[in-house]
Amino acid sequence: MTDDPAKPVGPDADRLPPWLARQLQNLLEQRGHALLLAGPSGLGQDDLALALARAWLCERPTAAGACGQCTSCHAVDVRTHADLLVLLPEQLALELDWPLDERTRDKIEKKEIKASKWIRVEAARPVVAFGPPTRSRGATQVVMVYPAERLTIDSAITRL
């Protein structure tokens, strides 16, 4: 615990560097339907985006973010939350231990395709079907595209 009332307190605030914990709190206070987190590489936009997704999907959120204890928080942590769709280039997904769809994983393992540095159109297509009728747990669904500049033109058009 801290004596500083300006410092956010909570599981996500403890996971993030102080400058990102403050941004998380600001973003939670001004929730919109879409956000673009941009900045130089290495500042933690991906960590901030995931903490924000956790807070939005949390069953018992606090003012500082996700509770870190509920089933939903656990599902985000182990990368299995049905209401979180993360679009990553295959190469980055493998590096960060994010699951790939079974078909793509099999093709990469059989060396039929190389893991891409780009977000392919095949990966973006599920976003079209990912919507209110497919909600699993609550009223919120989150699509996280990281890094957005790795969308191919075709996958960006599919996403729209």
Language-model features, listed with the residues they occupy:
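Clamp-loader machinery-focused feature within the broader ASCE/P-loop NTPase space
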Residues: 2-154
